[in-house]
């Protein structure tokens, strides 16, 4: 039998601080990922061909816009609508379900990016691996469509699992003679089972990401040993490409593990222990991780860095023109 601890009330100051931090995280995450999306989308508008990596980054940034929006809605629900002494309301459960699906799509896209780096950077010697790398490079658009299809399938299965257990809850209520406490526990456990189901579907892309990232790491080590033997030039383009790719992949791995741990810990905090402060901390960590990886992607991509430099130069020149105009106005006065 499940035993629930006492419900921790949250002061107005804590809720206000959490909401302020959530607004900042949403603003930073939205701006960074919208920047990546707009830079790549502008190339599409100008009818310039997008590289495979740019296509993946475009899809990845769009999926993270949804992630940040859902996490911000979750923060609003926690601070204003959801009382942990009551069962989770329907709107909050829908937000959590959509977040699980968007997070899984994000993982599939990261696995696709890792495979793309492998196909471009690793020099394979086996015929099968050479053909596989060539196939990945040629079929990247189909892989992206496949990711969307897998996300849709996962959505249907998660919704089926969730509402199927909801039917079990309704049937249970009829036979429990209005035992509301047990009904609340079963309703909350429905979300937990759906959460576990989504995480099981995340195992294949996560393993794919780990294998391809491991192959890229081995390739980097082999390339560095070759450089020590045959050349003294430390500025090798292939080496720099390896390092930049690994930085983006390792940073994603770290941020994803941290975010997943926070999400997993938040479930018992939300359902069993009703610790709203703990849930707020977990939501804050989950919102910060995609923003951090977006910053790493911008710093490691030459086109995005050039766009940032252009924007900063434009802002600097605009401020200078405005300051000169104000100085001229004062002189005339």
From Swiss-Prot:
Q: Which GO terms describe its molecular function?
A: bitter taste receptor activity; G protein-coupled receptor activity
Annotated localization? Membrane
Single GO cellular component annotation?
plasma membrane
How this chain sits in the membrane, per its record, is: Multi-pass membrane protein
Q: Which residues are glycosylated?
A: 178
CDD domains per UniProt: 7tm_TAS2R38
Which ranges of this chain reside in the Cytoplasmic compartment per its record?
A: 39-55, 116-142, 212-251, 298-333
Where is it chiefly localized?
Answer: membrane
Q: Which UniProt keywords are listed?
A: G-protein coupled receptor, Glycoprotein, Membrane, Receptor, Sensory transduction, Taste, Transducer, Transmembrane, Transmembrane helix
- Which parts of the chain does the record assign to the membrane side Extracellular? 1-17, 77-94, 164-190, 273-276
Q: What InterPro entries is this protein classified in?
A: TAS2R, TAS2R38
TM spans (from-to): 18-38, 56-76, 95-115, 143-163, 191-211, 252-272, 277-297
Q: Which domain of life is it from?
A: Eukaryota
Function, in words? Receptor that may play a role in the perception of bitterness and is gustducin-linked. May play a role in sensing the chemical composition of the gastrointestinal content. The activity of this receptor may stimulate alpha gustducin, mediate PLC-beta-2 activation and lead to the gating of TRPM5.
Regarding protein family, the annotation reads:
Belongs to the G-protein coupled receptor T2R family.
Extra information:
Most taste cells may be activated by a limited number of bitter compounds; individual taste cells can discriminate among bitter stimuli.
Q: What is this protein called?
A: Taste receptor type 2 member 38
Origin species, per record, is Papio hamadryas (Hamadryas baboon)
